[in-house]
Curated annotation (Swiss-Prot):
GO terms for molecular function: magnesium ion transmembrane transporter activity. It comes from Schizosaccharomyces pombe (strain 972 / ATCC 24843). CDD domains: Alr1p-like. Residues 406-419 have a biased composition (Basic and acidic residues). Residues 1-20, 58-82, 420-430 have a biased composition (Polar residues). Belongs to the CorA metal ion transporter (MIT) (TC 1.A.35) family. It is found in: Cytoplasm; Membrane. One of its GO terms (biological process) is intracellular magnesium ion homeostasis. It comes from the Eukaryota. Residues 337-347 have a biased composition (Acidic residues). InterPro entries: Alr1-like, CorA_cytoplasmic_dom, CorA_TM1_TM2, MgTranspt_CorA/ZnTranspt_ZntB. This is Putative metal ion transporter C27B12.12c. The keyword Transmembrane applies.
Length: 803
């Protein structure tokens, strides 16, 4: 830690001789100390002294004098007090803060006329104006508290009053045995570091330069940097630091070092405001605890070479701080930078998102087919068991389903003899199997994360070809037996081909299964996002099949809605994933148990059986559509007009069902064809050749059903058009009949018009011809005229075919 030598002011115009004498003494003393330090092996640099900058020269020589005093042993005759005005923090504790970087012209102290006259004169470097120096108080404990005001008696932790002697000799208060100890204690208080240099700071930048002054205001920053450089020399190489510090302060127009420079290319000096100054009566404990004073040193900062320090954007220079506010036009750029930093921080924090990307490389163990990672499954099961132990309400839920004869999806309509033993055996097995709940009555609409197991008790089903029972569990860890601790007991080769069926797996379960079975991220992504496109993909250790089924329960609102079935086939077994309950896994398991004594139940065969069961599920619906189409076609020809509304409804529902089935079946034949082609190409991972024969049969069924649906759609479309045309013709006939009836009514009205006229005339209270006669000649004459006119009108109407 280094100190600046305070200079005593001149005492008027009559003290010139005294000033010169003290200046010479200080100069000689300074040179003597420098020479002694040089003799002892310590490099001391002598900065350049300019006669035109008295205050600059005073500061530089004072810095040099104090540098030599700090590095030399403390003598018993000359002791230096340590006012906090010179307490400069160490380099590791200096930080540039953006909120404290706004310079403002400090308030000038009112000086007397006598002092102003003295300040105009050239004062030697060892002297200064008495008006610029107040009585200083040094804290005996930490040496960092100082105040220019008069101390109060009731204040604790205050230093004693120390006055400077004319010989620039200061007394060290009690409690500070060594200058190095004092500098260490004063290094944590950065807010009192440049209290004496108030109003003398300059702020030079490499971009837009802010030259507040040339001579007076640049000395504080240079001297501060020189003092900080000298303070670091106590701990590191003094030779390099002394040379660097002397070169930095050699001229007033030179730029600051890199660590004190700010690159402000868009800022404007007009936006500078001075920050609020801290209280001058702050205690030493508050100063030490201040967050701006104890700044950790960055790991890349060097203590021996200040020129290699990285450029910082903010700085803290104790009380003389600067705050530079950018222009308004650059606000959008700063906002964009903040957003970029926020995005980068979020990306750094969410490393799991990066690992879930499909392009993230798989582990080295996953590139080689080494079977199943049982450690991953065991760790996940252990975590689930710990969660279950913490939750007292949860209990392990396991269920075993027994064997049931395989039943096709369509009903056998052939007559059965009640005395036939085979039919009675079939009914007994059906009754026994009905007691075992093989399908839960719950449905999960859409993709969701399972948080409660109450609505889906059995989401995992484990099947082995050599066992008669299927294990059903609500969570993955419940598949293990009570005494088992590893999944190796489930996936052992002695149990045959394994099959793990997963209903609505969560993201964590998908991640664990993908890692345990070395599933490619592309496959995992297709399963998680529920890819709807049907396809077949071959990977290193498995092939992936996406096949769609439909909801078969007519009582549900989403009846006939698509249901995606994802099949991952390995050589040792297969994994199936679906996000809605389905009967296909249970049907395939029953079929595998019945045929395991006659066929080789492999993973390829289970995949074929599952695809075949999904394909067979369309058969009853297509037959029903065929029957409905024929009935509608017949009803259109013989149907009554009263049944028109019901017929249109039937046609609409049948067409909707037909198009739904056609949309589900469209593309399945191509998938099966591709899978069968892989079998014939002798792929290592593809299904075997005998499975290709059965896949060809499935392809034929799919092509037949697709063509039938296409024909049904054409029939229904034509029937719909014919029925609409028939309804139109019937409507036209009805309109023509209505028009004929209206024409007749119009004719009758026209014929009765003359009769109304005649009867109206005779009914009036006017003289009528033949009123005075006593016979009926006039009456019958008028009646005959009316009847004649009616006859003539009728003849004319019939002649010209008016109706």
């Amino acid at each position: 830690m280094s100190f600046q030598q305070p200079s005593n002011g001149a005492q008027g115009g009559n003290n010139n001789a005294l000033e010169k004498t003290s200046s010479n003494e200080a100069t000689s003393s300074s040179s003597t100390q420098v020479s002694s330090l040089s003799a002892s092996g310590i490099s001391v640099s002598t900065p350049r002294v300019s006669p035109f900058e008295p205050e600059r020269n005073m500061q530089v020589q004072s810095s040099q004098h104090l540098e030599a005093n700090v590095q030399s042993p403390v003598s018993s005759q000359t002791t230096y007090a340590t006012p906090s005005a010179y307490a400069v923090p160490q380099e590791s504790e200096i930080e540039l803060h953006e909120s404290e970087m706004v310079p403002q012209k400090p308030k000038k102290k009112k000086r007397s006329r006598r002092n102003r006259k003295a300040s105009r004169k050239k004062i030697p470097a060892t002297q200064s104006s008495s008006a610029d120096m107040d009585t200083l108080h040094v804290c005996p404990t930490c040496g960092s508290c100082s105040d220019s005001k008069k101390p109060q008696s009731n204040k604790k932790h205050r230093g004693r009053r120390v006055k400077h002697s004319p010989k620039s000799t200061l007394e060290v208060p009690d409690g500070i045995p060594d200058i190095k100890a004092l500098s260490a204690s004063m290094g944590s208080s950065s807010q009192h570091a440049s209290r004496y240099n108030e109003g003398r700071g300059s702020f030079d930048t490499l971009g837009t330069h802010y030259h507040l002054s040339k001579s007076r205001k640049s000395s504080s920053s240079d001297s501060l940097y020189s003092v900080s450089s000298m303070s670091i020399k106590n701990d590191s190489n003094s030779d390099s630091l002394s040379s660097s510090s002397s070169s930095d302060v050699s001229g007033s127009d030179e730029n600051l070092p890199i660590d004190k420079t700010l690159y402000l290319s868009v800022e404007d000096p007009s936006f500078m405001v001075h920050p609020r100054r801290p209280s001058a009566t702050k205690s030493c404990s508050a100063a030490v605890d201040c967050p701006h004073t104890t700044i950790p040193k960055p790991p890349y900062q060097s203590d021996t070479d200040l020129t290699e320090l990285p450029t910082k954007s903010t700085a803290q220079f104790s009380d003389e701080t600067f705050t530079v506010q950018p222009r308004l036009k650059s606000t959008h750029s700063s906002i964009a930078d903040n957003e970029d930093r926020e995005v980068d921080s979020q990306v750094d924090e969410n490393t799991r998102v990066v690992e879930e990307d499909v392009c993230f490389p798989m582990q080295e163990e996953s590139h080689v087919n080494k079977g199943i990672d049982f450690d991953e499954l065991d760790n996940f099961a252990e975590e689930e068991l710990q969660k279950q132990r913490q939750n007292t309400d949860h209990f392990r839920s396991r269920q075993y389903s027994t064997c049931k004869p395989f039943e096709p999806h369509w009903n056998d309509l052939s007559p059965h003899d009640p005395n036939d033993p085979s039919s009675s055996l079939h009914s007994n097995n059906a009754e026994k199997a009905a007691e075992v709940p093989l399908r839960s009555s719950y449905y999960s609409g859409g993709r969701r994360s399972v948080t409660s197991m109450s609505d889906s008790p059995y989401r995992f089903s484990f099947f082995s070809s050599n066992q008669n029972e299927t294990i059903h569990a609500s969570v993955l860890s419940d598949l293990l037996d009570d005494g088992a601790t590893s999944f190796r007991s489930l996936f052992c080769p002695e149990k045959g081909v394994w099959w793990l069926d997963c209903l609505d797996p969560t993201d964590i379960e998908m991640r664990v299964l993908s890692k345990a079975f070395s599933i490619h991220p592309l496959t995992t992504e297709d399963i998680r996002v529920q890819e709807a496109r049907e396809k077949v993909e071959l990977f290193g250790s498995y092939y992936f099949v996406c096949f769609r089924s439909f909801e078969q329960d007519p009582e549900l609102a989403n009846y006939l809605e698509p249901l995606n079935m994802y099949i991952v086939v390995f050589r040792e077994g297969l994994l199936t994933f679906h996000f809605s309950s389905a009967t296909h896994p249970a049907s395939v398991r029953r079929r595998a148990r019945q045929l395991r004594d006659y066929v080789h139940v492999s993973s390829d065969w289970l995949c074929y059986a599952l695809i075949d069961d999904i394909t067979d599920a369309f058969v009853p619906l297509i037959r029903g559509i065929e029957t409905e189409t024929e009935a509608i076609e017949d009803s259109v020809l013989v149907g009554r007009s009263e049944d028109s509304s019901d017929m249109l409804r039937r046609i609409g529902e049948c067409r909707k069902k037909t198009m739904g089935m056609f949309r589900l079946l469209y593309g399945k034949a191509d998938v099966i064809k591709m899978l069968a082609k892989r079998c014939n190409e002798k792929w290592t991972i593809a299904p075997t050749g005998e499975i290709g024969l059965y896949l060809g049969d499935i392809q034929d069924h799919l092509v037949t059903m697709t063509s039938n649906l296409s024909q049904f759609e054409k029939i229904l479309s034509r029937t719909h058009s014919n029925y609409l045309a028939q309804l139109t013709s019937n409507s036209i006939e009805e309109n023509s009949r209505t028009n004929g009836a209206l024409g007749k009514i119009t004719l009758i009205g026209t014929l009765l018009v003359p009769m109304n006229l005649v009867t109206g005339l005779f009914g009036m209270n006017v003289p009528v011809p033949g009123r005075d006669t006593n016979n009926l000649a006039w009456f019958f004459g008028i009646l005959g005229v009316l009847l004649g006119s009616i006859a003539i009108g009728w003849i004319i109407t019939m002649r010209y075919n008016a109706f």
